[in-house]
UniProtKB/Swiss-Prot annotation:
Glycosylation sites: 400
Sites of S-farnesyl cysteine lipidation: 585
Region (Disordered): 1-34, 391-433
Transmembrane segments: none
Chain intervals for the UniProt region annotation (Linker 2): 217-244
Biased composition annotated in UniProt, kind: Low complexity: 391-410
Name this polypeptide is given: Lamin-B1
Native source organism of the sequence: Mus musculus
Gene that specifies this protein: Lmnb1
Major place of residence: nucleus
Span list, region Linker 1: 71-82
Length: 588
């Protein structure tokens, strides 16, 4: 054991204080047996005390468990009553919603009748407007004839002004070319001086290099003379001859290069000087001809100015007549615009009323669906806790909610609890959503969000599908919008791509998630249809979603069908139910 008992400490002290006297083997064996028996008795006493304390603690824990189970039972009973109350309130709200929906449908029929009457009135006003537009076109034809005459006069004026501007531009160009020629002559003079300086510097450099080469030759010759001391006289003469021949060839090469460079400089200088002289002569002759043309242009401008004054008088008369016609046309346009704005305002008011009724209807439908889902979630949570606590289940009722034509199952597990299989069957006695889809190619339309947030496509084949030039068209009633894929986009085999609206709150993650920045929503309505066309304009897939609304004649008893809700133990305990503790003690 970890600690020694007081009896053991006392015996150890007595053994330490005993005199060291010799004992017989029998005495020693008896003492050892006696000591072992005492130790075993001490250990047994400690063990009995430990067992008693554990039994006491176990009884206290069992009492706590019993009390907590009683508290949990009371809380569960209260929570069940609270859920039943909320369920009854939700059912009453659902009934009120159904009645309100029927009223709204009746009002919608009235508004449709009023809308048809307004359409008839609008057609009559359209015929009146077409007559006014015919008169307007007649006035515009007369105005166009006058505009043509005025445009002819203005065109002649502009052509004369253009000729004058062309002559001025030619004079400016000639003066600019003359100044450029003078500048070129100065540049050529400077270039000549620069080339002469460069020739002088190159000559000096050549002289310097020649001196350096001679020094190097002398140095090389001295080195060879020192090396040729050990060589016989025949070999020495041969080396000197080769060295002299090599030096002679180097001198000839350098002289030839210097001569070529001098000849090139002289040829370049003479050619540029001749070009400058010819350019100066040409510029002088051009300036003289330009002066003659300028004199002729001045005389022509004077004659054209007199003609222009006459045309301006005629133009002023035409402008006065045009002003009168424009005033008459403005009055007619104001009257037509006023009538058209009145019709548009009436149509806008009718559209706003219809849109308000539709939005109210959609809000009521969303409230109903949310209530149904919440009721199912509460009931499923309650049944899960009853099953976990092994309580008798309450009588179930059935509530149906329609969100899509498909069904799905959700499985949740927690520790060693029993797995709960929840199946969502989506149908409604009052509102139902039906889907229909077809595809003739590798790509199909997998899903259309009923809230207008996204449309999802899927490549069902084992090959990549290029989507360049493909178009996806969404139709709701008479309105339609289209989305085109980029030329480089490719949908991988077995992959899905989701095209999100701009207000969906999703960030782009190509190639699986794309954002349509120009469209805030794909749109919602009772009849939504999406068509997918390839780059040749052929329809390869389509999917439609139709909302069917019926008014129930009488309310029947409904059975509960749980919607996919994950039953989590932590959420239940946050609402006030304590956790059960299961502890046991093992006595070794």
């Amino acid at each position: 054991m970890a600690t020694a008992t007081p009896v053991q400490q006392q015996r150890a002290g007595s053994r330490a204080s005993a005199p060291a006297t010799p004992l017989s083997p029998t005495r020693l064996s008896r003492l050892q047996e006696k000591e072992e028996l005492r130790e075993l008795n001490d250990r047994l006493a400690v063990y009995i005390d430990k067992v008693r304390s554990l039994e006491t603690e176990n009884s206290a824990l069992q009492l706590q468990v019993t009390e907590r189970e009683e508290v949990r039972g009371r809380e569960l009973t209260g929570l069940k009553a609270l859920y039943e109350t909320e369920l009854a309130d939700a059912r009453r709200a659902l009934d009120d919603t159904a009645r309100e929906r029927a009223k709204l449908q009746i009002e919608l029929g009235k508004f449709k009748a009023e809308h048809d009457q307004l359409l008839l009135n609008y057609a009559k006003k359209e015929s009146d407007l077409s007559g006014a537009q015919i008169k307007l076109r007649e006035y515009e034809a007369a105005l166009n004839s006058k505009d043509a005459a005025l445009a002819t006069a203005l065109g002649d004026k502009k052509s004369l002004e253009g000729d004058l501007e062309d002559l001025k531009d030619q004079i400016a160009q000639l003066e600019a070319s003359l100044s450029a020629a003078k500048k070129q002559l100065a540049d050529e003079t400077l270039l000549k001086v620069d080339l002469e300086n460069r020739c002088q510097s190159l000559t000096e450099d050549l002289e310097f290099r020649k001196n350096m080469y001679e020094e190097e030759i002398n140095e090389t010759r001295r080195k060879h003379e020192t090396r040729l001391v050990e060589v016989d006289s025949g070999r020495q003469i041969e080396y000197e001859y080769k060295l002299a021949q090599a030096l002679h060839e180097m001198r000839e090469q350098h002289d030839a290069q210097v001569r070529l460079y001098k000849e090139e400089l002289e040829q370049t200088y003479h050619a540029k000087l001749e070009n400058a002289r010819l350019s100066s002569e040409m510029n002088t002759s051009t300036v003289n001809s330009a002066r003659e043309e300028l004199m002729e242009s001045r005389m022509r401008i004077e004659s054209l100015s007199s003609q222009l004054s006459n045309l301006q008088k005629e133009s002023r008369a035409c402008l006065e007549r045009i002003q009168e016609l424009e005033d008459m046309l403005a009055k007619e346009r104001d009257n037509s615009r006023r009538m058209l704005s009145d019709r548009e305002r009436e149509m806008a008011e009718i559209r706003d009323q219809m849109q308000q009724q539709l939005s109210d209807y959609e809000q009521l439908l969303d409230v109903k669906l949310a209530l149904d889902m919440e009721i199912s979630a509460y009931r499923k949570l309650l049944e899960g806790e009853e099953e976990r606590l092994k309580l008798s289940p309450s009588p179930s009722s059935r509530v149906t909610v329609s969100r899509a034509s498909s069904s799905r199952s959700v499985r949740t597990t927690r520790g060693k609890r029993k797995r709960v299989d929840v199946e969502e069957s989506e149908a409604s006695s009052s509102v139902s959503i039906s889907h229909s889809a077809s595809a003739t190619g590798n790509v199909c339309i997998e899903e259309i969000d009923v809230d207008g947030k996204f449309i999802r496509l899927k490549n069902t084949s084992e090959q990549d599908q290029p989507m360049g030039g493909w178009e996806m068209i969404r139709k709701i009633g008479d309105t339609s919008v289209s989305y085109k894929y980029t030329s480089r986009y490719v949908l991988k085999a077995g992959q899905t791509v989701t095209v999100w609206a701009a207000n969906a709150g999703v960030t782009a993650s190509p190639p699986t998630d794309l954002i349509w920045k120009n469209q805030n929503s794909w749109g919602t309505g009772e009849d939504v249809k999406v068509i997918l066309k390839n780059s040749q304009g052929e329809e390869v897939a389509q999917r439609s979603t139709v909302f069917k609304t019926t008014i129930p004649e009488e309310e029947e008893e409904e059975e509960e069908e749980p919607i996919g809700v994950a039953v989590e133990e932590e959420r239940f305990h946050q609402q006030g139910a304590p956790r059960a503790s299961n502890k046991s003690c093992a006595i070794m």
